[in-house]
Regions:
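Signature of multi-pass transmembrane helix bundles
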Residues: 1-54, 163-293, 311-313, 385-409
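Hydrophobic alpha-helical segments, principally membrane-spanning helices and signal/leader peptides
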Residues: 36-39, 46, 95-97, 132-140, ...
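Sparse, context-dependent recognition of short Cys/His-centered cofactor- or disulfide-binding micro-motifs
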Residues: 60, 94-96, 136-139, 240, ...
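Short amphipathic alpha-helical patches
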Residues: 65-76, 89, 102, 106, ...
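Membrane-embedded alpha-helical segments and adjacent helix-loop junctions characteristic
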Residues: 29-128, 257-346
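C-terminal transmembrane helix pair
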Residues: 114-115, 122-161, 167-197, 323-409
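Short, structured coil/loop segments at alpha-helix boundaries
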Residues: 25-28, 93-97, 134-137, 227, ...
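Generic signal for short, ordered secondary-structure residues
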Residues: 101, 105, 140, 231-234, ...
Length: 409
């Protein structure tokens, strides 16, 4: 519903701005430019979707091997000690615990097709424990904040888009996204725990969160000792080594399960073509809307206004061109994806803005969409502090993404 209003606003605002430019400034080229943008954007959307097919097939095939090889189950076991303390209101041994573990593990691996059904199942089981059927419980809110914070280990789709948009090194945003999404998730956990008075100062949580924070701090400190060129080389090398290791580990996991790894890959890869075709209308819709908005001059007015505000406050304005992606992400995943593609098209995939838009896309998730789908599936009307905690996690991810990208790029 939110995306519907945003899409309509693109055209109505563009019409108003273009009319003002035509009537008061004598700009007779603005309407031809807007119409040309609709054709160009439609063509771009199709070409992007077509180019995604091969890489999507590759990674969906790899993910299918990992899924069938039990990697999700292994991750769930690793997360178990931490999650039992984040959800103290869930009775020990309740089956919802397994659904939550599996959902978060699937999200971390980027297995959206598996994560969503598992998440909806977890919400149904949490609703069974709910004494006020129209009001969100503490475990529901913590579960949704973990989803909206966008914790991911493998930002496959973003790397795929970067490859299609001509990035020299599509994986160079891998480490920055890992760091930014860590801060987003950490902020979400801390803020929600404060609301719910969950004690994070026990030994397990301190060791886990403290250990992860120490590792992240060490990574940031290590990169801070390098110049930009060296940092880029090391980041790129680490990202590609990790991705290659993930592929090999998934294959070994499949072999350990006596899986026909090749057939599993083919099964997953078939979904690549279907997925690429399925996103064509969504990409056409959002890219045409953004194209008209930009061609009318409205996007430049928005960005220039934010730049003026930031510069007035004495800040660096390099990040402003990527902000539309960050602002759109809590509202709509496809809208934010369109903004990310538009940023790479306008500024270049290897520009600071293009890279930052990708990190924005990977550091958080679609907060309002997730809340609507998950709460709507079980009839929750009163969401309590869920929106506040989700948006604070998003804000932490955006701030972290900006700081990290200034350091890396």
């Amino acid at each position: 519903m939110v995306l519907n209003y945003i899409w309509i606003a693109f055209f109505l605002i563009a019409l108003v701005i273009a009319t003002v430019r035509l009537v008061f400034m004598g700009d007779v080229e603005v309407f031809p430019a807007m119409m040309n943008s609709t054709f160009d954007s439609s063509k771009t959307a199709f070409e992007i979707s077509l180019g995604l097919t091969g890489v999507l097939s590759l990674w969906l095939g790899i993910m299918k091997i990992g899924e069938k090889g039990g990697v999700v189950n292994v991750l769930a076991k690793v997360l178990s000690p931490v999650f039992t303390r984040l959800f103290p209101d869930i009775p020990k041994g309740h089956p919802v615990t397994g659904s939550i573990f599996m959902n978060v593990a699937a999200n971390m691996l980027g297995l959206d097709n598996a994560a969503t059904p598992l998440g909806l199942r977890a919400m149904e089981q949490l609703q069974e424990l709910n004494t006020k059927k129209d009001t969100a419980t503490n475990p529901m809110i913590m579960f949704l904040v973990l989803n909206t914070s966008g914790l991911t280990l493998i930002p496959v789709s973003i790397m795929v888009y970067r490859a299609q948009m001509g990035a020299a090194q599509p994986t160079d945003i891998f480490v920055p996204i890992l760091l930014a999404t860590f801060f987003s998730t950490l902020a979400g956990i801390v803020v929600t725990s404060i609301y719910q008075r969950i004690n994070l100062l026990n030994r397990t949580m301190l060791l886990t969160l403290g250990g992860m924070s120490a590792v992240v701090a060490g990574i940031i400190w290590g990169f801070a000792q390098m110049d930009k060129a060296q940092m880029n080389v090391v980041s790129r090398s680490v990202a590609n080594i990790l991705l290659m290791l993930i592929i090999v580990v998934f294959i070994l996991a499949g072999m350990r399960k006596k899986l026909n790894v090749y057939d599993a890959f083919i099964e997953g890869a078939k979904e690549g073509f279907t997925t690429a075709v399925r996103i064509i209308p969504y990409l056409v819709a959002i890219l045409v809307g953004i194209g008209v908005f930009r061609a009318s001059g409205a996007m430049d007015m928005l960005i220039d206004g934010i730049k003026w505000l930031v510069s007035t406050l004495g800040g660096n304005t390099d990040f402003v061109g990527a902000l539309p992606t960050a602002l759109m992400k809590p509202l709509s995943g496809s809208g934010a994806r369109g903004m990310m593609v538009d940023a790479m098209t306008t500024y270049g995939a290897d520009s600071f803005v293009g890279r930052l838009a990708c990190v924005f896309q990977g550091s958080t998730d679609t907060t309002f969409y997730i809340l609507a789908v998950y709460f709507g599936s079980v009839g929750i009307r009163y969401t309590r502090h869920a929106v506040a905690c989700g948006l604070l996690a998003d804000l932490a991810g955006v701030v972290a993404a900006i700081a990290i990208c200034y350091m890396f790029f």
